[in-house]
């Protein structure tokens, strides 16, 4: 029997975290190619360290996207994040680009030809999850860990009061107490943030960030019992890639559900939407969110599995965690009928062949508001009526 009273913790990292800098750059490259050629293929990895950025990977796209243009976009991304420090500066960092053509062996398995539909770009398993414990149908710990950092980043970049003294690199962690299976209280709050003023100590930083943290959390969640850990090492001036080397794809739990749901292991950033690590994970979230939004369950986990070069998923698995109002086996059948879960079908339905990915690189790929230009389309709940009708 599932526990109903427990503590659960999730963490988030800011857009200035070294790994997130790399995710942002990799997705900036993806967007640059998709803007010129919606069918472009990319697998782009980025490394960032002290005043050096290395971009490498495989590309099939137009020659109009030059390395000079990619360097310009990379510097603009780093500038937007806020890095203008001696050890990592958008203007002075060395940018090296090593992109080459996609493997023909991979392309032949993925490309559509004759009667063969477009196949998956790789094998793998992908999970989607939704829960009714927040308005965004996301687990509360990761949802609020993201919100804290996003609000602080907005204040820092907008130079709002004392928040202007903060740097781009930050991490948050929220421990939530559940009672009767519902989130009711934040028992522990961890916030480490870079600061530009070397005279600031932990108390000084807490004075800056605490109002934003309290505003981000539900009003009753912060109590006299809540334990705070703000910059517990005392000083955090050297940050970002100058303090720790960053790599694309190292924050896959931050990107998804904060550990509250399984993860298939594949990262998202730097990949075009033919790669099911990304597109099928988005589709699984889309399905799970619509299941919960339709009132068919309070929680839903969906797994999809693929083989390279094969169009249709090998399996669909649904777990409603004992909260369902419909048989899981029936739902598994219906989900495969109401949405074409081939790579092409997912990309077409969700409109994924667009430059919409740089914005996903920080503060979570899920639990976001859909954008008018098609960004975060997998967060829509437009399958609710179709689901209900198919199950009637």
Curated annotation (Swiss-Prot):
Please state where this protein is localized.
Cytoplasm
- What's the record's note on cofactor binding? Binds 2 divalent ions per subunit.
One of the entry's Gene Ontology molecular-function terms is: magnesium ion binding
- On whether Thylakoid is a keyword of this UniProt record, the answer is no
Offer a single GO CC term for the protein: cytoplasm
Enzyme class, spelled out: transferase
Cite the binding residues for ATP. 17, 169-171, 235-236, 244, 250-251, 267, 271
* Reactions accelerated catalytically: L-methionine + ATP + H2O = S-adenosyl-L-methionine + phosphate + diphosphate
Q: What family is this protein classified in?
A: Belongs to the AdoMet synthase family.
Q: Quote the function comment for this protein.
A: Catalyzes the formation of S-adenosylmethionine (AdoMet) from methionine and ATP. The overall synthetic reaction is composed of two sequential steps, AdoMet formation and the subsequent tripolyphosphate hydrolysis which occurs prior to release of AdoMet from the enzyme.
Question: What is the name of the protein in this document?
Answer: S-adenosylmethionine synthase
- Origin species, per record, is Methylobacterium sp. (strain 4-46)
């Amino acid at each position: 029997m599932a526990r109903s009273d427990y503590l659960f913790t999730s963490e988030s990292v800011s857009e200035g975290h070294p790994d997130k800098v790399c995710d942002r750059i990799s997705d900036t490259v993806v967007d640059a190619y998709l803007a010129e050629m919606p069918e472009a293929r990319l697998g782009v990895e980025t490394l960032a360290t002290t005043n050096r950025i290395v971009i490498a990977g495989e590309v099939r796209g137009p020659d109009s996207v030059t390395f000079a243009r990619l360097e310009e976009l990379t510097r603009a991304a780093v500038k937007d994040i806020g890095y203008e420090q001696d050890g990592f500066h958008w203007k002075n960092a060395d940018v090296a680009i090593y992109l080459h053509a996609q493997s023909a062996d991979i392309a032949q398995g993925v490309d559509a030809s004759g009667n063969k539909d477009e196949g998956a770009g790789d094998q793998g398993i992908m999970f989607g999850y939704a829960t009714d414990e927040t308005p965004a149908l996301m687990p509360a710990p990761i949802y609020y860990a993201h919100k804290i950092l996003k609000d602080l980043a907005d204040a820092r970049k907008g130079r709002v009061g004392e928040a202007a003294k903060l740097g781009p690199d930050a991490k948050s962690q929220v421990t939530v107490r559940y009672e009767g299976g519902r989130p009711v209280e934040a028992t522990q709050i961890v916030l480490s943030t870079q600061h530009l003023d070397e005279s600031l100590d932990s108390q000084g930083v807490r004075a800056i960030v605490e109002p934003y943290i309290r505003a981000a959390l539900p009003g009753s969640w912060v109590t006299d019992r809540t334990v705070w850990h703000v910059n517990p090492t005392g000083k955090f001036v050297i940050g970002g890639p100058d303090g720790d080397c960053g790599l694309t794809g190292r924050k896959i739990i931050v990107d998804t559900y904060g550990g509250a749901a399984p993860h298939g292991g594949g990262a998202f950033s730097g990949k075009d939407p033919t790669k099911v690590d990304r597109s099928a994970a988005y589709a699984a979230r889309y399905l799970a969110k619509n299941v919960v939004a339709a009132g068919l369950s309070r929680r839903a986990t969906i797994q999809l599995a693929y083989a390279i070069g094969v169009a249709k998923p090998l399996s669909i698995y649904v777990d409603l965690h004992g909260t369902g109002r419909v048989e899981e086996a029936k739902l598994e059948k219906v989900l495969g009928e109401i949405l074409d879960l081939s790579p092409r079908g997912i990309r077409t339905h969700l409109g994924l062949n667009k430059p919409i990915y740089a914005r996903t690189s920080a503060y979570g790929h899920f639990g976001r508001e859909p954008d008018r230009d098609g960004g975060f389309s997998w967060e829509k709940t437009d399958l609710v009526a179709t689901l209900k009708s198919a199950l009637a």
